[in-house]
């Protein structure tokens, strides 16, 4: 029995609250159960130096956790003077995932920065960040079109992510913290809305997993992501 009584393939309740802050071109509070992340999308004219003159845009991301997002307080990374390896890995993942959602040539020479700040962590903060940031990105791109700065919306489709894993020998979808900390296998999967894979991060924490178990986990992830994408689209229609 899972902690919340969920079935193996069931994601936690997902809520996407748009326009959560007033200054950013796109802002979303995303909630996966008790995991809560504030995602904002900020537009700047111009691109990084390595892209200048190429007629395409860029999407980048930053990720962080509030000190008391977790069970015990973690000092701000700014106070330590440097970002941790986990933070850098996650923000690169978010940026890669969201670049797959956009035609960068159609975006033109704009840079969109996605800031994902974890308010409360209960497992799956990176997958929640990708899911919420995609909706914030969609709102920001819609504003570029509405303001006449772009003729065509460069959004190719939604992107979402979910964690899957093996806990006590059972493959399950969307792990909360107590499950994640006990997982024999832990995996994060990012997909497009039509089920194509953008990224898979999978690790055997204990017993190695088989090829068949990998396919089972990917199928679980696809089902979970289909449900999450439906929630994303419903949020954008409201």
UniProtKB/Swiss-Prot annotation:
Function: Phosphorolytic exoribonuclease that removes nucleotide residues following the -CCA terminus of tRNA and adds nucleotides to the ends of RNA molecules by using nucleoside diphosphates as substrates.
Native source species: Salmonella typhimurium (strain LT2 / SGSC1412 / ATCC 700720)
Domain of life: Bacteria
Keywords: Nucleotidyltransferase, RNA-binding, rRNA processing, Transferase, tRNA processing, tRNA-binding
InterPro entries: ExoRNase_PH_dom1, ExoRNase_PH_dom2, ExoRNase_PH_dom2_sf, PNPase/RNase_PH_dom_sf, Ribosomal_Su5_D2-typ_SF, RNase_PH, RNase_PH_bac-type, RNase_PH_CS
GO molecular-function terms, A-Z: 3'-5'-RNA exonuclease activity; RNA binding; tRNA binding; tRNA nucleotidyltransferase activity
CDD domains associated with the record: RNase_PH_bact (cd11362)
Gene: rph
Entry annotated with the keyword Nucleotidyltransferase: yes
Residues that coordinate or bind phosphate: 86, 124-126
Family under the similarity heading: Belongs to the RNase PH family.
Transmembrane segments annotated in the record for this chain: none
Record protein name field: Ribonuclease PH
One Pfam family hit: RNase_PH
Biological process terms in GO annotation: rRNA catabolic process; rRNA processing; tRNA processing
Catalytic activity reported: tRNA(n+1) + phosphate = tRNA(n) + a ribonucleoside 5'-diphosphate
Enzyme class: transferase
HAMAP family, alphabetized: RNase_PH
Description of how the protein assembles with itself and partners: Homohexameric ring arranged as a trimer of dimers.
Assigned EC number: 2.7.7.56
UniProt keyword Glycoprotein present: no
